[in-house]
């Protein structure tokens, strides 16, 4: 779990930024309901991620094809887990709220890698480079109202899991959103992303901590 993380982002006032797959990992049939049809952008830590929330941010950009200029992220992640075919998966899921619109990287998701270059505080420059191999199934960006996501998961998708704690996760998301709406931000950190050209990144000053 310490090497796996995801980012559940909310666009104001109450829309969730998610991924939608057309087929399952196991089997090629197209269906209206299967495990992880709707999913949270997430992935595994790599050698460039200094902190686990950097894994969450990097995977969000790689999988959605979008990035944020300004966001408030709750600093305590939720440990989301589910069981599939006897294997239990665990991810540290960070929940955040985007200020303003998401920016488009202009590339198809998962066709590039993202490197985060840290600056002051949690300000990052992001560098995109082409990916030589892609083993991910095709997923598209989907942005839906929070309650619609909760209702869909509860009525259509949770019964595809042998077990999970998604119900507790939904309560956690509601709690984080309530704190944000009430301007109780002491447990949030502000993060910003700025895309730069790989050649420009080489000329930029080193990270500031």
Swiss-Prot record:
Gene3D superfamilies: Nucleoside Triphosphate Pyrophosphohydrolase (3.90.79.10)
Domain Nudix hydrolase: 1-167
InterPro entries per UniProt: NUDIX_hydrolase-like_dom_sf, NUDIX_hydrolase_dom
Protein name, as recorded: Uncharacterized 24.3 kDa protein
Natural source organism: Orgyia pseudotsugata multicapsid polyhedrosis virus (OpMNPV)
């Amino acid at each position: 779990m310490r090497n796996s993380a995801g980012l559940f982002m909310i666009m104001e006032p109450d829309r969730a930024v998610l991924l939608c797959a057309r087929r399952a990992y196991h089997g090629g049939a197209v269906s209206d309901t299967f495990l992880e049809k709707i999913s949270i952008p997430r992935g595994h830590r790599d050698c460039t991620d200094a902190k686990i929330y950097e894994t969450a941010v990097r995977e969000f950009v790689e999988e959605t094809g979008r990035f944020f200029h300004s966001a408030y992220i709750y600093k305590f992640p939720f440990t989301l887990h589910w069981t599939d075919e006897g294997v239990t998966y665990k991810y540290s899921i960070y929940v955040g709220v985007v200020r303003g619109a998401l920016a488009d990287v202009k590339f198809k998701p998962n066709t590039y890698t993202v490197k985060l270059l840290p600056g002051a505080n949690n300000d990052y420059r992001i560098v995109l480079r082409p990916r030589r191999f892609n083993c991910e199934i095709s997923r598209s960006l989907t942005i839906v109202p929070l309650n619609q996501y909760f209702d869909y998961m509860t009525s259509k998708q949770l019964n595809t899991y042998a077990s999970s704690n998604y119900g507790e996760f939904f309560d956690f998301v509601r709690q984080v959103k309530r704190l944000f709406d009430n301007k109780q931000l002491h447990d949030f950190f502000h993060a910003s992303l700025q895309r730069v050209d790989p050649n420009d990144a080489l000329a930029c000053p080193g990270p500031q901590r």
